[in-house]
Amino acid sequence: MHNEAPIQRRKSKRIYVGNVPIGDGAPIAVQSMTNTRTTDVEATVNQIKALERVGADIVRVSVPTMDAAEAFRLIKQQVSVPLVADIHFDYRIALKVAEYGVDCLRINPGNIGNEERIRTVVDCARDKNIPIRIGVNAGSLEKDLQEKYGEPTPQALLESAMRHVDHLDRLNFDQFKVSVKASDVFLAVESYRLLAKQIDQPLHLGITEAGGARAGAVKSAIGLGLLLSEGIGDTLRVSLAADPVEEIKVGFDILKSLRIRSRGINFIACPTCSRQEFDVIGTVNALEQRLEDIITPMDVSIIGCVVNGPGEALVSTLGVTGGNKKSGFYEEGVRKDRLDNDDMITQLEARIRAKASMLDESRRISVQQLEK
């Protein structure tokens, strides 16, 4: 029931990664990267499909060798989500995966080779209508820029990016997006701000090597949140030393928190105190797990008492406010019913699923069907 975010997005060009539009007002795409050995085709395919199930728009796959390129061919045949091939050092690998139907090529200008090799990759991408991501990273800047600036700075990352943007411009190639990633939040944010003022190509956002599941999610939320709130960014990846599935979940949570793009349920829950009339924490944790398959956007407030419960329910799609033995249930801000506190999880799940089906007619079901 909350309004969309009052964020004016930066104007950018439109490109396509497979069938996914990037830039020019398209929904911000959420992506992740596999962490299996690419030569293990079965494991990589299984991980990509797991990422698809939680909503990944795009998946990146590292292709470090020609053997991995051959494995990529088999992987591409078994998945439907667009795949980006991550290429370092050997430009010939980019040419090989282009033959196998890659949807986007990610190259690092700091290590892909000389201008002639880049030209070869660009010509191939143009012929096969494959977009490119220029991926600048603070940890792998070109040697001359390291010497010039002494350490990674926003100006160094910008100069690296613009060097290769200019090269693609000279080659009359405009089907590309750019990233300027760093593990330091301030360095990354300022680099993206500078770049956003210089070009109108789509920008891929990320705080690289952000850390483990908790710290990395926090760091990414701060860095990406700052940029997104300023209208900067057309696609993103949350980089975590964790299951890649968690990257997709955190990515959507960031977009959901800024009301930029919603997928699934936005739970609003109190941190609990002695006033709670039912187990709020247990209820929320259980429902988050049970309802991961719901993709219909909706706000669900779960508040343990009547202090803030009615107010939150007023602006939620569905809401519950803790009461003695029974708790008030609200729909679209209107109190409808009372739910038994001892059976709260099952009752709420049924009502949430029924509401989701009402909002999505193709999956319409009834509360009675769910409560049997």
From Swiss-Prot:
| Signal peptide limits | none
Known cofactor(s):
[4Fe-4S] cluster
Domain of life from the UniProt record = Bacteria
Name the SUPFAM superfamilies on file.
Dihydropteroate synthetase-like, Nitrite and sulphite reductase 4Fe-4S domain-like
State if Lipoprotein is listed as a keyword: no
- What Gene3D superfamilies does UniProt report for this protein, alphabetically? Dihydropteroate synthase-like, Sulfite Reductase Hemoprotein, domain 1
Q: Which family does it belong to?
A: Belongs to the IspG family.
Q: What is this protein called?
A: 4-hydroxy-3-methylbut-2-en-1-yl diphosphate synthase (flavodoxin)
Please tell me the species this chain comes from.
Cronobacter sakazakii (strain ATCC BAA-894) (Enterobacter sakazakii)
